[in-house]
Curated annotation (Swiss-Prot):
One family name in Pfam for this protein: IspD
Site keyed Positions MEP for the nucleophilic attack: positions: R164, K220
InterPro entries per UniProt: IspD, IspD/TarI, IspD/TarI_cytidylyltransf_bact, ISPD_synthase_CS, Nucleotide-diphossugar_trans
EC number per UniProt: 2.7.7.60
Keyword annotations of the record: Isoprene biosynthesis, Nucleotidyltransferase, Transferase
EC main group: transferase
Protein species of origin: Acinetobacter baumannii (strain SDF)
Stated family: Belongs to the IspD/TarI cytidylyltransferase family. IspD subfamily.
Name assigned to this protein: 2-C-methyl-D-erythritol 4-phosphate cytidylyltransferase
GO BP annotations, alphabetical order: isopentenyl diphosphate biosynthetic process, methylerythritol 4-phosphate pathway
Function in brief: Catalyzes the formation of 4-diphosphocytidyl-2-C-methyl-D-erythritol from CTP and 2-C-methyl-D-erythritol 4-phosphate (MEP).
Length: 238
């Protein structure tokens, strides 16, 4: 185990990895989390990164017909749990939280991380968890928006330039206490709110969420070209 902040090593930490999505932008037939980078699948790389933290366990929310995930060589496989995913990412996360609530305390912390985000660094993970625990507040990794943003109309014509001064691009992991996050997602779904990440659910019930500086190389594999980029990033980080 690499050097951890004291609070991190003393806290019960869990992880949830929603991995039931079809990833239609990547391929109509192939799942991006099961593509190979070197000798391991994307999701194995992702779990390996998260396992640098002293996790009590992690839950993979997978498709109902998925028989492949359980055959993979996950890091600390004795800590792996599996549950059925849902129609959307938010439903997969909620299913995993419902699973966790049977084996964990509602005041335990949970990191929710994209299955197709295998390049997150230990330093970012450690800082995220430390900040959340020290402030007793939910947190996400994020980076300030760098590029100029344009708002366009339906004809793809620019209407105005959007100020990026206070805009951050959300990443994962996103960390919260299990009970609070579960309540936030349940409430948001009940109110038919559009939930794109955990922070948006937490915001909807008035929870404060802090941003912790991430890194631009914490990419999410979305398109086939991203696989090669992820391979190069992992190679350079190692």
């Amino acid at each position: 185990m690499r050097h951890l902040h004291h609070q991190t090593s003393q806290t019960k930490l869990w992880a949830v990895i929603p991995a039931a999505g079809s990833g239609s932008r990547f391929s109509k037939t192939e799942l991006k989390q099961y593509q190979y980078i070197q000798d391991a699948t994307v999701i194995e790389h992702t779990v390996k990164r998260l396992s640098q933290l002293p996790l009590t366990g992690y839950v993979l929310a997978i498709g109902k017909q998925d028989t492949f995930a359980s055959t993979l060589s996950f890091q600390d496989k004795h800590k792996a749990h599996f549950c059925n995913g849902g129609v959307e990412r938010v439903h997969s996360v909620l299913n995993a939280l419902n699973y966790l609530s049977q084996i964990a305390d509602e005041d335990d912390w949970v990191l929710v991380h994209d299955a197709a985000r295998p390049c997150v660094t230990f330093e970012c993970l450690n800082t995220l968890v430390k900040n959340a625990i020290e402030t007793n507040q939910s947190a996400i990794l994020a980076i300030p928006v760098r590029d100029t943003l344009k708002q366009v109309n339906q004809e793809q014509q620019i209407e105005k330039t959007v100020s990026r001064e206070l805009l951050w691009q959300a990443q994962t992991p996103q960390i919260a206490k299990i009970g609070i996050l579960k309540k936030a997602i349940e409430t948001a779904l009940k109110n038919n709110l559009t939930i794109t990440d955990e922070a948006s659910a937490l915001e909807s019930i008035g929870e404060s969420v802090q941003v912790v500086m991430g890194r631009s190389d914490n990419i999410k594999i979305t398109y086939p070209d991203d696989l090669e980029l992820a391979r190069l990033i992992l190679q350079s980080q190692n």
